[in-house]
Amino acid sequence: MDSLSLPTVCDVVVPALNVDNLIRDYVSNVRADDSNNVSRFLGEVALKEIKSQVDTSNGDFQKLNVGFRLTPDEKNALKANFPGLEIAFRDSCHSSHSFAAAHRVCETLNIYNRFKTKTERIIDLGGNYVTHAKQGRSNVHSCCPILDVRDGARHTDRYISLAASVENRHRELPVDFCCHKFEECDVKAPFAMAIHSISDIPISTVATHCVRRGVRKLIASVMMDPLMMLYDKGHIPLLNVDWEKEDVEETGKTLIHFHFVDAPGLSYSHDFDTLSQYMITNQVIVNNSYSFRVERTACLSGVYIVEMTLSMTDGHSLAYLKPMRDVSCAWLSSLRKKVFVKLAVPISAEWYTEQFEVRHALMDESLVRYVSEAAFRQFSKTKDPETLVQYIATMLSSSSNHVVINGITMRSGSPIKFDEYVPLAVTFYVMAAWRYKMIAPGIDAVKTRTEKNVDILDEKGLIKEDFNVVNALLEDAGLIEPKLPHFTDVIKNAGLRGFGKKTIEKTRDDVLLIKPRSLLREVIYTVRSVFGLTILDSDYNLVSGVPSHMKATHVWSVFVGNLAFPSCLNVNECVNELLVNHMEMMEETKKEETRQQAFKDARDRALMTIAKAIEKDQTIKDGLLPILDLCKIKEELTAASNSLSLTPEAIEQTDSRLMKASGSDVNPYADSIKEAIHYFNEVEVANTRNLRSLGIYLGWSIPKNKQTYDALQGRNESVRVYVPYENKWYPSAPTSQYERAMTVDGYFSLPMEFEAITDGCRREISKYHLLVVDDSCIFCSGQRMIPALEAALKLVPTFKITIVDGVAGCGKTTHLKKIARIDSSAAGSPDLVLTSNRSSSDELKEVIDCPDVMKYRIRTVDSYLMLKSWFSAERLLFDECFLTHAGCVYAAATLAQVKEVIAFGDTEQVPFISRLPEFRMEHHKVKGKISCTTDHLQMSKRCHSLFKENFLQKQDCEVSERCSSLAELCPIQSVIQIQPERDVLYMTHTRADKETLMRIPGMPKDRIKTTHEAQGETWDHVVMFRLSKTTNLLHSGKGPDLGPCHNLVAISRHRKSFRYFTVAPHDNDDQIVKCINYARSLSSGDLDGVRVLI
């Protein structure tokens, strides 16, 4: 900039959560897991609920990893300075200035988030472009000039960091930087940021080039201290930085040096005149056309956030160019309850002269008050000043240092500088002497008669008005409201001034100023002031507040030719343009969504047509089968089955059997079917949320510590992480094949062969750092059944339901085998036999006598609903119907067009239980006509008569003598006392106990089940175990909804022996323990009395 353009300076909004409702829902839905309690529920479920309502991917809730090792005080300071950032302290590396480095990282993210944009361009003055690239900030352009060797070394370090990122991450890094100065770069952007990089650039230059580059707002962080305006040196505590000013005589400049105490090789020097501009400037006017508002918005442990905001216009007013002379309070937070005390410090010890430097010391207001009061109490005219100064110095010493007695801090203060110790004591002595001298005049002043506002009111409450003859005559002469004083007042004020009388002047309501007046003294003072002799007079203003030069009232003006802002500044035009662009973008987005949806619907209709051909018998040849070898139909069908575009309308258009119900006729079981659809969708949402939370925990990147993978299995041992770059699974290889995996972009289809990912799939997923899977990724049956459930809603069923209700072990499955008609030669259509689980289906295929070609009609209800086309039958036999949601039973019966449904089950055993504790079901039980007239269905061949008295609610059921052995109670202290045995089923009520036993080496994991999972199975020997001493509703059988059904399932799985291993053998609330103890008290005759012989 030339001399003509030098600047001149002149002094001038989640829905609120109801915690009571959360607790109430938890208490009413508590189930088998005894580790669940109120604190865990509030800590996990409520936290998930809050996170689901808050966008944590951007803005104030971003997680920031800080690897520097910090002290607890430094960590607390970072959290206090940046409350909107979720900071994770890793303590993985050490630095001599760790807090300053960590603070700089937090400043960068904090200032970047203040702009609230990821699309608008941002200029970073001297920014670390590698850090921006790693964080995915593609909208940041960094101006990184090389001004000295330190800047060049920074580029080397950034290059090394960038090379490591390219090698490890294998993904695009949005690097955007230049080596030009801010004044020379031509990149334009509406926003700019500077992290400790503008301390050497005059504020007028910054404002000028902000106009040239189209910057509307600049936010910078500057290391400053308000005491720089007062002292020559100081210290910033947490940053551990010493600063010192130095006057350079050759250049006439004042430099300020910053020295990091623990980093001797790290120091900075700036021109103090330039740095101080950011302390005291309120406004910068450029070319009398543009105006920047300068604000210091926050003080963060010695780092001030300075904002320069360009003023917009209304198109006709120039009020935004008016200099603003208000007072900034930027420093007041640091100077609160502080005062400046005047003192004189000797700077020479020569015999012929004594030179004193008069300056101010910053002290606590409470300390000044305490010492000044004590000094006045000890003051005496009989004592010499030296002795009194010693007394005051002693009080200063004890009051300004920490006093600790028995480990308790009784007084805390700030130490006084060595050269200010005695001069401060002299100042307090002068204050005490001056106050002592003012006692006599004060006595005269307080005795002076004065008037209050109430004294000038008359009896009616009106102000008394004295008649002034002179003012009345002047009004008659034509003057308007003359206000000459009364003649008596003039006599009082000027009459005896030369003889020491006083005058009284009213300053404000009920406040009067009493001034002694002496004509002779006033004349002498006037003569002395004319000749400049008053400069040596005494000044007792020894304590003052914040100096005026620290209150930021400066306005800068700068002029540069050919300068114009590149965009519009009219607020009306800018707002209108923004809204118009937003509407156009919304319309374009809507058109694109409509086009994508139309494409998906057309694709799904075509794929459903092909699917019917794929489901045909492979022995039947037609023209569609060769398509499988020509294109990727199977992959497309897999993608289509997971698509939400498979609506019932799409199925209706491809299957002629699905005829719409006419008029108001709908499926009478719609409530149950819709509840099943809603449940499966909620389970899918929960699975997706859990997998995403695991990925977010890893940061969707490869962790440096391999033990992090083990931590993921804390609550779910099925979690696995696949790293494409290493082609390796963590923490261990999978035991199953997965059909999908969660990535940072969502689910990804994962074709596997022999538990290994195919080469083609590996190439496609190489762009991801890692993939996360768990048991929900093996096979997602719920989402595959939804199209069938939705299709069933459109049909009107004609079947009737008969429920064959039998106790555990009474032979319900045997009865089903007898009445099943699956032979193709049977009269009418063969039966359809469905089960709730695969083990029951495999068992029925073995025991039901039918040709192999007809065994496809014996299957699970899930597999039937997942068919692309459903075969029909006249009768549906359903085994263990209460283990499946009633909506699936009704939908299968509707799609099979059956006329009769015979459902086998036990109403006293465990019903269908939701995996989601917060999901409440109302229509999950199959309803129909109860039938248990068959004699042998009223007798249990598996359950001892003892348990009939305690568990079975059916009054007409009986037990068989065949099960004559008693149950055995086995007290244990630890899980390791349970030994692995062959042909034994291990059962427990809670999943936590199951996971604990599965960790024991040698235990058969396939034979360890919960009572809910073991329902419907029969074993000769059963071991029931309990590893928690806390009794829950499952052990006591006092649940309001389930009752003792879990205990009934537990004791009805064995034929020969039942052993109960428990850590709480004396728990009287445990229903099984209570029954076993009761059995021990009975004789064989007592047991025979209740047995029924066959």
Curated annotation (Swiss-Prot):
Residues 777-937 form the (+)RNA virus helicase ATP-binding domain. Residues 88-279 form the Alphavirus-like MT domain. Involved in the virus replication. Contains a helicase domain and a methyltransferase domain. The methyltransferase domain is probably involved in viral RNA capping. Involved in the formation of ER membrane spherular invaginations in which RNA replication complexes form. GO terms for cellular component: host cell endoplasmic reticulum membrane; membrane. GO terms for biological process: methylation; mRNA modification; RNA processing. ATP binds at residues 806-813. Interacts with RNA-directed RNA polymerase 2a. GO terms for molecular function: ATP binding; helicase activity; hydrolase activity; mRNA methyltransferase activity; RNA binding. Residues 802-1062 are annotated as: ATP-dependent helicase. Pfam families: Viral_helicase1, Vmethyltransf. Residues 68-409 are annotated as: Methyltransferase. Belongs to the bromoviridae replication protein 1a family. InterPro entries: (+)RNA_virus_helicase_core_dom, Alphavirus-like_MT_dom, P-loop_NTPase. Keywords: ATP-binding, Helicase, Host endoplasmic reticulum, Host membrane, Hydrolase, Membrane, Methyltransferase, Nucleotide-binding, Transferase. This is Replication protein 1a. It is found in: Host endoplasmic reticulum membrane. Its main location: host cell. It comes from the Viruses. Its EC number is 3.6.4.-, 2.1.1.-. Residues 938-1093 form the (+)RNA virus helicase C-terminal domain. The lineage of its organism: Viruses, Riboviria, Orthornavirae, Kitrinoviricota, Alsuviricetes. It is a peripheral membrane protein.
